[in-house]
């Protein structure tokens, strides 16, 4: 009897320790916790990620308007994973890590099918250039039916996004929401586009139009993500010095297609007299923002001093 009584405190302490361990694992990782429950014979336990209960009320972003409802975007994320389209993602095998983020952001028509091991399979927000909308419409079921929970944010100049019937891209989007009523498609307002141009001028001292350049989809992604996310982890984006570093890794411009070399494309755009993206200049700005916001870059790693 005395032996049993001595064991009870030890059992109680062990049980409490186990509960604390499970709670800690739940806080640290909402994804692998259900797998641990399976080990205890509860595979059918209904699981609600703790991060769902901790989320802040949705924040309204008035610079982005729903094509169907004409309502502004409501979005608020905790930890965001922003996945680059770069060939740097090939072979990284960080798909599971990416999918553990509260919100996964992708750009343009970058696919997940066939690349899940490297880039994950979930997408919550997809920021898309007006020039990439026709690429989405080549496979509309994949982007707007299978991925109906994804929020699409389309950016483009007023001439293509105008709502008076003369905006060629806006007309495409209107037809898309008619065909796919569950699709969540938002367009960037003219005022927000002007704001993004202003940020570029403030950060670089250069007028975007006068310098003959176009902002990249990455630029628009960062502008929105910094408003919507508490912290940001960027995967597969190179910094401004990468292409001049001896022995740098040569990769395709996109992870999902062979062809253009990433660094060649960056240098071509950076020095184009007209119509180019200032990718390298933008990366300098991103590094500056990382000093002020909770932003980290990996695969490859950035040193932000």
Curated annotation (Swiss-Prot):
Tagged with keyword Cell division: no
Keyword tags: Disulfide bond, Glycoprotein, Glycosyltransferase, Golgi apparatus, Lipid metabolism, Membrane, Sialic acid, Signal-anchor, Transferase, Transmembrane, Transmembrane helix
GO cellular component, one term: Golgi membrane
Tissue and organ distribution: In adults it is highly expressed in spleen, followed by kidney and lesser in lung. Not found in liver and skeletal muscle. In newborns it is abundantly expressed in brain and kidney.
Pathway in which this enzyme or protein is active: Protein modification; protein glycosylation; Glycolipid biosynthesis
InterPro entries: Glyco_trans_29, GT29-like_sf
Cytoplasmic side: 1-8
Residues in the Lumenal compartment per record: 30-305
Disulfide bonds listed in the record: 80-229
Name of the protein in question: Alpha-N-acetylgalactosaminide alpha-2,6-sialyltransferase 3
Source species: Rattus norvegicus (Rat)
């Amino acid at each position: 009897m005395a032996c049993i009584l001595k064991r009870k405190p030890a059992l109680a302490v062990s049980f409490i320790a186990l509960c604390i361990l499970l709670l800690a694992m739940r806080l640290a990782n909402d994804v692998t916790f259900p797998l641990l429950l399976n080990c205890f014979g509860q595979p059918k336990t209904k699981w609600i990620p703790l991060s769902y209960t901790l989320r802040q009320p949705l924040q309204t972003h008035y610079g982005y308007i729903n094509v169907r409802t004409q309502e502004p975007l409501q979005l608020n994320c905790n930890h965001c994973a922003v996945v680059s389209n770069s060939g740097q993602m090939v072979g990284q095998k960080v798909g599971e890590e990416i999918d553990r983020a509260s919100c996964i952001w992708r750009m343009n028509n970058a696919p997940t099918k066939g690349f899940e091991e490297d880039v994950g399979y979930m997408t919550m927000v997809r920021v898309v250039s007006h020039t990439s909308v026709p690429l989405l419409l080549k496979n509309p079921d994949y982007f707007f039916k299978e991925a109906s929970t994804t929020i699409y944010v389309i950016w483009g100049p007023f001439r293509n996004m105008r709502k008076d019937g003369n905006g060629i891209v806006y007309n495409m989007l209107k037809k898309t929401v008619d065909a796919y009523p569950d699709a969540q498609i938002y367009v960037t307002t003219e005022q927000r586009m002007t704001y993004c141009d202003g940020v570029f001028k403030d950060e670089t001292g250069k007028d975007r139009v006068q310098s003959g350049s176009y902002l990249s989809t990455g630029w628009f992604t960062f502008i929105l993500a910094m408003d919507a996310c508490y912290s940001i982890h960027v995967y597969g984006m190179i910094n401004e010095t990468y292409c001049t570093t001896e022995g740098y890794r040569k990769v395709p411009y996109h992870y999902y297609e062979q062809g253009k070399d990433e660094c060649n494309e960056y240098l071509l755009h950076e020095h184009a007299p007209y119509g180019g993206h200032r990718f390298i200049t933008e990366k300098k700005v991103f590094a500056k923002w990382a000093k002020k916001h909770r932003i980290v870059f990996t695969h490859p790693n950035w040193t932000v001093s």
